[in-house]
């Protein structure tokens, strides 16, 4: 649970309400602990958006942004970057397409009319006119980005000079798969950008400083830390 109030689509965490519940007495507090060992506070989505805009603006050919399909705020930042650069956006990967259709229908994902195109349409467009937002951040063998890296994707062929942005974190245990995909993309000649190169990801899991703030507000009798 990140406490930042600068997310593109979310309401800020209602800390006064949590404090009121603490006054009344909380028997059990279940709280995210994924980044509990990381000191300080997590980065904000507002810090990521300008970087994505710059990377998309400076790219000469196709841009492919890999993100978690559940991270609608990040996808909105990617869409905003594409719009600012005069590019269309296509979603790639079953979960990404489904989630963004729902997000758009509910008003959580917004773009000027005509921004979104299908993958079939994107495959026929000039590379510098489109941004693909895709699944596959963890090197899943059947995910869209992995199939692109193996040159097995039905609609898109990654070419020398394309820009691939991993706007995600590396989940422990997936290193071999992710680096394998990165290596294949690099061998093609793509410009691969990860969070180790430039700040293109902010965790949605609060750091130790944010968790301390929450626990001080809630003051529970019992706590059950959990990790997603």
Regions found by a protein language model. Give the residues of each.
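C-terminal regulatory/interaction regions
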Residues: 80, 84, 103-109, 114-228
């Amino acid at each position: 649970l990140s406490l930042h109030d600068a997310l593109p689509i979310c309401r800020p965490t209602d800390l006064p309400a949590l404090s009121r519940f603490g006054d009344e007495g909380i028997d059990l507090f279940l709280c995210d602990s994924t980044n509990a060992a990381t000191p300080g506070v997590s980065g904000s989505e507002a810090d990521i958006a300008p970087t994505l805009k710059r990377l998309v603006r400076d790219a000469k050919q196709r841009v492919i942004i890999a993100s978690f399909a559940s991270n609608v705020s990040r996808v909105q930042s990617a869409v905003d970057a594409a719009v600012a650069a005069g590019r269309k956006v296509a979603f790639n990967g079953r979960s990404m397409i489904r989630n963004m259709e729902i997000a758009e229908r509910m008003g959580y994902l917004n773009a000027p009319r005509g921004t979104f195109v299908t993958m079939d349409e994107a495959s026929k467009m000039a590379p510098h006119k489109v941004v693909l937002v895709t699944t596959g951040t963890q090197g899943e063998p059947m995910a869209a980005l992995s199939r692109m890296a193996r040159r097995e994707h039905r609609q898109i062929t990654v070419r020398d000079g394309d820009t691939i942005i991993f706007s995600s974190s590396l989940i422990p245990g997936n290193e071999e798969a992710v680096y394998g995909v990165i290596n294949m993309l690099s061998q093609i000649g793509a410009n691969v950008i990860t969070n180790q190169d430039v700040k293109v990801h902010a965790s949605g899991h609060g750091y130790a400083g944010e968790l301390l703030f929450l626990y001080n507000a809630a003051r529970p009798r019992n706590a059950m830390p959990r990790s997603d």
